[in-house]
Amino acid sequence: MNRVAVIHGPNLNLLGRREPEVYGTKSLENINKEIEKRANNLKIEVDIFQSNHEGEIIDFIHDNYKALSGIIINPGGLTHYSIALRDALAAVRLPVVEVHISNIHKREDFRHRSVIASVAVGQITGLGTEGYLYALEAIVNIIKKGSY
């Protein structure tokens, strides 16, 4: 069975409370339950991880990539400047789908650039928390095709 990591970056632990007009009212716990349910329907295993610390996210990738078939990541604020996270994702040579709940291209100028996008097979942005579920379906198809 394929195993996919779903990584939530900084401040995503505050979903449901943080700027609900931008990110909605679902808590991270509820989002994770939806992810687990969809993964079960798709017959894949998911490892869900959240950290507010760049190094912990990189360590998680390093420590787990050999058991993974792909990575779904919402890097949060790390999207715009974390070359170290970008390099960690590139180094493990797995398909990566980048997810953003809000449309980063409709927000402040500094949010328009993603350093992660260049190592991702695709990016889902602005479709709310459903973006995680679309990413699961996409990564399953990418893994089946074996090309990324």
Curated annotation (Swiss-Prot):
Q: Which GO terms describe its biological process?
A: amino acid biosynthetic process; aromatic amino acid family biosynthetic process; chorismate biosynthetic process; quinate catabolic process
What is its pathway? Metabolic intermediate biosynthesis; chorismate biosynthesis; chorismate from D-erythrose 4-phosphate and phosphoenolpyruvate: step 3/7
Q: Where is the signal peptide?
A: none
**Catalytic activity field:** 3-dehydroquinate = 3-dehydroshikimate + H2O
Q: Which residues form a coiled coil?
A: none
Fetch the PANTHER family from UniProt.
CATABOLIC 3-DEHYDROQUINASE (PTHR21272:SF3)
Instruction: Output this protein's name.
Output: 3-dehydroquinate dehydratase
Lineage at the top is: Bacteria, Bacillati, Bacillota, Clostridia, Halanaerobiales
- What gene makes this protein? aroQ
